[in-house]
Structures are given as structure tokens and as C-alpha cells.
């Protein structure tokens, strides 16, 4: 009979620093211990959940003595919800940790030769800063310890909110989210209340059954609101009644869409978004430029910080008005158009066709005539022949997804030999890997992080490069 593993409890652990992925760090007999939701200065008892040769992971079993820096979390869902994990950490300490994260990835781990990293650009708003949130309907919500699951009806087990970390089939029923301004919370709570009252079924991710699947709320600084409601199957009568009820309750919704998504995953990128009522898009403005945002469009989710991010990008590009600029991973062409007035010509490339259509419309609406946009996989479009046909870039701006750039793309960039590059990244680790390749022919001249997501460990980083 196998012997049951005995729990490892570490007492009076002193938390020393903030570590990678938002965890905190302590040292125990030469080994590193990573602890969720801890703050430097905390003294805690920790239950170890993973033990390897050089490190351990665990969670706080008992708070012996809280750090003088520790703050009371402002959200009632803290600790279960997977977002905003740094609520107990003062914002200044969050910024310091993100600055350190960039240094660690580029210098300590990446061994790149970089100048002094500029101070991180903080966010003026640390709550209600997102312009987009997605909520999931589930028949299996997270049941708390003080609840009797057996006594709950099937409807009482329904939830509408966010997936719980490590439990793909569990959803936290969110009462109030501090990430997106109203009417986001009001819309979500109304839809849940209506659905329960009318007996509409929520999605079961294990059995792949149920009516309501997920919902996306997008908002703008101008007060536009877009709602995309996703159903697992069609039921014209029930769907129409729900959409009409939403439209009547929230006249401020300017774009009301629905999707019938019967496939295995809940992504809508390959699904038809059907406009039920209102305008086909919402709009954001930046320095007099108007940007169309459709249901599938990518747009930086922190609008005010996006302006700061793009301003740093433009500053690092050092444009004089005569340059040909390539904007790779252009999205809806925001950066491309943001720098177009300081460039001779801008070429934007993006994988999502709908985003490129929006980019073209945006350029036309803004009276911009020096931007050309192309849709397709970057490694397939950006070839040596493409560069020869469209002209050698003087400046390349890159803003790739978390995975970074494909090796083939890096080769073409090096062959194109632009005078300068600006690399914008949401993942300093993959950025450091790519920079090692690019630094065969380039030197890093400036680095500046930007905080787009307060209360999380995520950080954007902007790097300027100059040809050797």
C-alpha cells in the first residue's frame, strides 16, 4: 500500500521580494520558495504544493504578521478570481517589480547590452481601466467552502463571470468587477437575472450543452458600448426575446451583436458576428484620429495607457517626415496612423483580415493617404520580395503577440536592414530572445516599460534599436 505523502508546512517564512508571474519569493535553506498573494515583509506559514530540487511553491496557510506595505484587497473576489493578483501590493511597489522584471529578462537572463532602463510609465487609473472584458456562462460555478453544494438547485450552481485558475470547467460568479467602467457590471447582472427568470440554460463545457455561452463588453472613452452575446445553438424565439430585453434596458448600448458558436472552443475570431441592433462598430479617438473597433478588432485594452505606449513608440522611432515605416502586427492600424503624419509612407501588416479592413477604413476616415495595409501571416507576407516591391524600410515598428516573432520574419528584417527599429512587446521574455537575434546587426539605444495592467504582473516594454 502506497504511503500517503505528508504535507510540508513551513512556519514563520519571511517574504523577501516580488518574483516572476506575480508570485512572491522567500529563501528556505538555499531553496527558493514561491508564494501566491504574498507581499514583501509578510511573515507567513506556508503549505508547500510543489517541491523540486531548487525551488518550492506554496500558498499562505496562516498570516503570522502582515507586512507594513500590505494593503486590504478592494475586490470581494480577490484570491479566487484569476485577475488583479497584486491588489495587496502598493502601486509603487508594483511598478518597481515590473521594472525589475524587464531588467531581469533583458539583462540578468538575456545578457543583452542595454543602456539604463528608463523609469516605467505608470497608469493614472488603476481601476476601471479596461475597455474590453469577456464573461463566461457556466452550469458549474465555483462553490465556496461555506456553501452546501448538495443543497443547491441546478440554477443556483449557474455562474456568469471569469474562469477560475487551474479549474478549466469552473467559473467564478462575479458580483462586481473593478476592471471595466459601467454599464459593464449592470449589463452582466441584468443578463444573468433575466436568464434565470426565463429558465435559459448556461453552457456546460464538459458536456458541450446549454444555450448561453459567453459575452463580451467593449466600451470607449466617448461612451460607446458594444455587447457581443454568444449562444451555443440557435433558438430564435429565446434569443430575440433576450436581445430585445437587453436593448430596452440599456439604450446606451450602441452596438448589439450576437454569435451562434457551436464549435469546441469559445473564440469568435472565426465566427460570424451578426449585428442585431445599432451601429456596426464603436469608435476611439487619439490626437484627432478616429479608430473603428468592430467585434473582432484588436485594440489595446487600456485606452489611456495605449496613448502613452504609442507616444513612447513614436518618440523612439525618431521620425523626420521622410522615412518609409513598416508597422508589423499592426492590428487596426493604430500605431501606423499614429506615426503617419511624421512619415513619408507607412506599410502595416496584420494576420486578422477584419482588423486590416478596419485599418483601411480608419485611414480613409482620417484622410490618411500614405498608409497601405496587408492581411496575412507575417512570415508569408513579409518576404525579401515584398520588401523589394514596397521599398526598403527606414524604420520598422514591431508589436507582435506574446510568442514574439517567427525566425523567418527576423531573417527578413535583418535582410531589409532598416536604420532603426522599435520593438513593442507584452512579453519581455520572448522580446529578449528576439532581440538577441536582431542584435547581430543592431544595438539597443533605449528601453522604457509601460504599465498597461495595474494589479497584475503583466508589463509592456518598448525597445529602440539602431543599425551598427
What are these regions (language model features)?
Residues 41, 180, 302:
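Short, conserved phosphate/pyrophosphate- and ester-handling motifs at nucleotide-, phospho-/glycolipid
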Residues 61-72, 79-201:
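Extended interfacial segments that mediate partner engagement and assembly in macromolecular machines
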Amino acid at each position: 500500500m502506497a504511503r500517503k505523502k505528508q504535507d510540508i508546512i513551513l512556519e514563520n517564512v519571511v517574504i523577501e521580494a516580488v518574483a516572476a508571474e506575480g508570485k512572491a519569493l522567500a529563501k528556505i535553506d538555499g531553496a527558493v520558495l514561491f508564494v501566491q498573494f504574498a507581499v514583501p515583509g509578510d511573515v507567513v506559514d506556508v503549505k508547500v504544493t510543489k517541491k523540486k530540487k531548487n525551488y518550492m511553491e506554496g500558498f499562505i496557510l496562516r498570516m503570522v504578521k502582515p507586512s507594513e506595505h500590505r494593503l486590504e484587497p478592494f475586490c470581494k473576489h480577490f484570491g479566487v478570481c484569476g485577475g488583479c493578483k497584486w491588489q495587496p501590493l502598493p502601486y509603487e511597489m508594483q511598478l518597481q517589480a515590473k521594472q525589475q522584471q524587464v531588467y531581469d529578462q533583458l539583462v540578468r537572463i538575456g545578457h543583452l547590452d542595454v543602456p539604463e532602463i528608463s523609469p516605467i510609465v505608470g497608469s493614472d487609473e488603476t481601476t476601471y481601466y479596461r475597455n474590453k472584458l469577456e464573461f463566461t456562462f457556466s452550469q458549474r460555478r465555483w462553490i465556496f467552502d461555506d456553501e452546501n453544494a448538495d443543497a443547491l438547485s441546478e440554477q443556483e450552481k449557474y455562474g456568469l463571470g471569469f474562469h477560475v485558475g487551474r479549474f478549466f470547467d469552473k467559473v467564478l460568479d462575479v458580483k462586481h468587477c473593478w476592471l471595466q467602467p459601467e454599464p459593464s457590471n449592470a449589463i452582466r447582472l441584468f443578463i444573468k437575472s433575466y436568464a434565470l427568470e426565463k429558465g435559459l440554460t448556461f453552457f456546460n463545457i464538459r458536456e458541450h450543452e446549454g444555450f448561453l455561452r459567453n459575452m463580451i463588453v467593449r466600451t470607449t472613452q466617448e461612451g460607446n458600448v458594444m455587447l457581443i452575446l454568444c449562444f451555443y445553438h440557435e433558438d430564435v424565439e429565446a434569443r430575440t426575446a433576450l436581445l430585445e430585453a437587453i436593448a430596452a434596458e440599456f439604450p446606451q448600448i450602441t452596438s448589439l451583436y450576437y454569435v451562434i458558436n457551436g464549435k469546441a472552443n469559445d473564440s469568435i475570431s472565426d465566427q460570424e458576428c451578426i449585428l442585431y441592433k445599432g451601429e456596426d462598430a464603436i469608435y476611439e479617438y487619439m490626437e484627432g484620429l478616429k479608430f473603428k473597433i468592430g467585434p473582432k478588432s484588436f485594440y489595446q485594452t487600456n485606452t489611456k495607457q495605449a496613448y502613452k505606449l504609442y507616444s513612447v513608440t513614436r518618440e523612439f522611432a525618431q521620425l523626420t517626415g521622410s522615412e518609409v515605416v513598416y508597422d508589423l502586427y499592426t492590428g487596426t492600424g493604430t500605431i501606423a496612423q499614429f506615426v503617419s503624419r511624421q512619415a513619408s509612407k507607412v506599410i502595416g501588416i496584420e494576420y486578422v483580415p477584419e482588423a486590416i479592413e478596419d485599418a483601411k477604413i480608419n485611414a480613409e476616415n482620417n484622410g490618411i493617404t500614405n498608409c497601405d495595409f496587408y492581411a496575412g501571416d507575417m512570415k508569408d507576407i513579409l518576404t525579401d520580395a515584398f520588401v523589394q516591391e514596397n521599398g526598403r524600410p527606414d524604420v520598422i515598428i514591431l508589436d507582435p503577440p506574446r510568442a514574439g516573432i517567427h525566425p523567418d520574419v527576423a531573417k527578413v528584417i535583418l535582410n531589409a536592414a532598416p536604420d532603426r527599429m522599435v520593438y513593442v512587446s507584452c512579453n519581455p521574455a520572448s522580446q529578449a530572445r528576439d532581440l538577441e537575434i536582431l542584435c547581430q546587426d543592431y544595438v539597443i539605444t533605449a528601453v522604457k516599460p509601460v504599465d498597461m495592467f495595474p494589479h497584475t504582473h503583466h508589463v509592456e516594454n518598448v525597445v529602440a534599436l539602431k543599425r551598427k
